């Protein structure tokens, strides 16, 4: 069975966000942590913690979503773009602007995961993993 960690974390964040759940858990991986670092730096989540799981080999990620006092999320949407069956690669000049710059695109480059704004500034392209707005 093949497993897509990007689809897993995006689906879990979307489902928890729609249900107004503040905390969620998932198995940890380096890719998931890199995605969460970007979401944290851009202000879309409150934080995350990594716990060692005694029963299993994988560590556990506890993700804290960000809501205001009226239970309105700071994350309006997150969508997977590049999928295992259809990878989407773009050059630095063709990096997409999400909602005319109001959102971000998460791009996997040869220098690691970064936002579309940072990749455009460094003039490097890569695989567009997700749109966040």
Curated annotation (Swiss-Prot):
GO CC annotation terms, alphabetical: ribonucleoprotein complex; ribosome
Coiled-coil positions: none
Keyword rRNA-binding assigned: yes
GO biological process, one term: translation
Gene3D superfamilies per record: 3.30.1370.30, 3.30.1490.10
Source organism superkingdom: Bacteria
Pfam families recorded: Ribosomal_S8 (PF00410)
This protein's UniProt keywords: Ribonucleoprotein, Ribosomal protein, RNA-binding, rRNA-binding
Cleavable signal peptide: none
NCBIfam families found in the cross-reference section: PRK00136.1 (NF001109)
Subunit structure: Part of the 30S ribosomal subunit. Contacts proteins S5 and S12.
Similarity field: Belongs to the universal ribosomal protein uS8 family.
Protein name: Small ribosomal subunit protein uS8
Organism: Mycoplasmoides gallisepticum (strain R(low / passage 15 / clone 2))
């Amino acid at each position: 069975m093949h497993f897509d960690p990007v689809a897993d974390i995006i689906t879990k964040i979307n489902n928890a966000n729609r249900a107004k759940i503040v905390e969620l858990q998932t198995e940890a991986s380096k890719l998931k942590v890199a995605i969460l670092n970007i979401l944290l730096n851009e202000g879309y989540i409150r934080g995350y913690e990594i716990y060692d799981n005694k029963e299993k080999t994988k560590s556990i990620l506890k993700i804290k979503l960000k809501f205001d006092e009226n239970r309105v999320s700071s994350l309006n949407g997150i969508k997977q773009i590049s999928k295992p069956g259809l990878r989407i690669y773009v050059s630095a000049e063709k990096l997409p602007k999400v909602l005319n710059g109001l959102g971000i695109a998460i791009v996997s480059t040869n220098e690691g995961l970064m936002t579309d704004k940072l990749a455009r500034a460094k003039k490097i392209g890569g695989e567009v993993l997700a749109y966040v707005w």
